[in-house]
Structure formats: structure tokens, C-alpha cells
Amino acid sequence: KRVGAVFKIPLANVLGGTGMGYFSTAYGLYSPVFAVTAAGIPTVMMRLTAQNIAANRPGNAVKTRRTALLLFSAIGALGTLLVAIFSVFFAEHIACSPESAPAVIAIAPAVMICCVASVIRGYHEGMSDVVPSSAAAVAEAVSRAVVGLTAAYGVVFRAKNRFECGLDILGRHYADYSEAYSAILPVAAAGAVAAVSVSELCGLISLLISDKRRRLKVPVGEQTDRSLTITRRLIREIIPVAASALVMNCVSFVDLLTVTRTLQNAVAADSAYFIGNYGAIIAECGADGLANFMYGSYTGVAMTVFMLIPSFAGMTEKTALPEIAAAWERRDVP
């Protein structure tokens, strides 16, 4: 979480409020899609794995993992495809930010990668082994910070050099650097968002390396459940968890749908007030871009700092749930 904050705060210095608005718009769509497709996978896999091990059915735990990989890989691929297909429509007509489309497309691959990684993550956590998850989380955070900041800085730095040399930027000549900077912000934001997909891939690679080091020993002749039975159980148990995660993520999605529109209406209704109080920002990004600037400042900076402390509370689940599930399976309850 600290590395994540180190990523977003300097990123805000590069992209500014406007660029962070593009960045946050991509996350605004990604969060509910992730909630539906992948958010509940670690919890369900953790619980089922712990129960199978407690019941002395390691073979069934391994088969559940294999079935879950096939099922959720397909669901993740569908989620990635839908995000990519509807990215332009979402950016233009729902988020009212057409410039965010490249960033939305860049985050699409993360959906499928997260689904696969979540299965392996939950499987190991169900064996009360959180080291693979911790190593993957660190790999994700570090790679996201390095790749994201490098991409964003690289785009801005190259555009500045081309402007100073009098060269075209994105196929167009600009007489003023502020206009050139505004033009390359969507590309810089997309580069920063692409780091999310790259970081998820790095986390998955870390999990796969850890996965080879610890495998359950399956006794010969162990009876396992049918694949169809396991699939039904996975779907049945993930629905309430995914629904809960979706409700929590809907708050940020509702913000995405309403905050920018409300600010745009407010600027149009009383432009004199906003020019008087935010004249410098309007001079930089225009009256139409003020709403996106404010939204980016709210989600990209303020909420990043605010969420640091609450995020630690959710970590207790990682150690508590496998033990609770195993005790429940053994009927070892007071």
C-alpha cells in the first residue's frame, strides 16, 4: 500500500488533476468489472481449499483448483473483451471523458490476469500459506510504480523534447506547450494505466514460481468430486461474495457517473464563480476540463491517502478465514 501511494502521488505531479482524471476513469470501470469477475475468487478458493484439506481430501483441493482455473480464465477473458469493446462508448457517453478511452483499453487485460492470479492466490491462502500472495503483492506494487512512472514520465519528457525542437507531436504542430501537454496527457495516462496490466502479469509470474515450490501430495485412488459438481459449487459460493464486492465498488462507480457531470453543470450554471476561484486551472485545462481536473484530484490524490489506513484492516482476513473454514469443516466450534 505504501508503494502504491508512492506510485500515485508522484504520478499526480506528472499527469496533474486532468491526467489523473483519465487515470481514475479507467479505474472507475475496472473496479466493478473486477468485482464481478475476480474479487470473490480468493475468498472462495481459500475457503474450499481449507475445507478439503481439513477433510483430508487433498486430491479434491487440487481438482477444485484446476476446475477454477478453467472456469475463471474463461470469465476473465470475457470481462477483458467486454471492457475493450465498450471502452470508447463508456468514455464518451457514460464518463463524459472521451480522452479516457486509451486508458480504459490499456487496463482491459488486467481483468483476465487477475482472475487467473486470484485462483492461485486463494489456493495457497487456503493452505495457510500467505507468502506467495505477499510476494506477488510486492511484485505488483513495485512493477506498477516503476513501469507506470517510467511510462508517464517518458511520454511527457519525449513530448517536451519534440516541442522544444519544433517537431510535430501526435501528428500535429503546437505553438504553445500547454496545448501540446494537454494533447499528450491521454497517452501518458494510458501508459500509467498499462502499468496496472503489466504489474498484474508480474504478480501472476511470482505466484506461478511459488506454486511450483509447494504442491499438495495426492494419495493414489482418492475419490474426487465431478468437475460439474465443483463448477456449480464455485459459482454458487462466489455469487454472494461478488455481489458484496460489487456493492462496495459501486460507490466509486457512482462517483464516476455523477461527480464529473455535476461539476460540469455547476461550471455552466455559474461560470463567473469558477473563473474567479479556479482561474489558473481553467487557463490550463479549459472550462470543460475543470470538472475532470477536480475529479482526478479527488480520486487520484485525496482518496489514495485516505485509503491507506483502512486497507490494513482487510488483511486480517488472509490469516483468519482459512482457520475458520477448517474448524467449521471439522465441526471444531464452541
Say what each PLM segment does:
Residues K1-T43, T80, P240, S244-T258:
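Signature of the first transmembrane helix
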Residues L78-P102, R158:
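Short membrane-interface helical motifs at transmembrane helix boundaries
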Residues I85, C96-I120:
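Alpha-helical transmembrane segments of multi-pass membrane proteins
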Residues A39-A54, F306, P310-R330:
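Helix-loop junctions and terminal segments of transmembrane helices
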Residues L11-P32, E99, S182-A190, T229-E237, ...:
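Interfacial/gating helices of multi-pass transporter permease domains
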Residues F163-V193, I205-M248:
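Interhelical loop/hinge segments that connect adjacent transmembrane helices in multipass membrane
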Residues A135-I184:
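Alpha-helical transmembrane segments of multi-pass membrane transporters
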Residues C114-A137:
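Membrane-interface junctions at transmembrane-helix termini in multi-pass inner-membrane proteins
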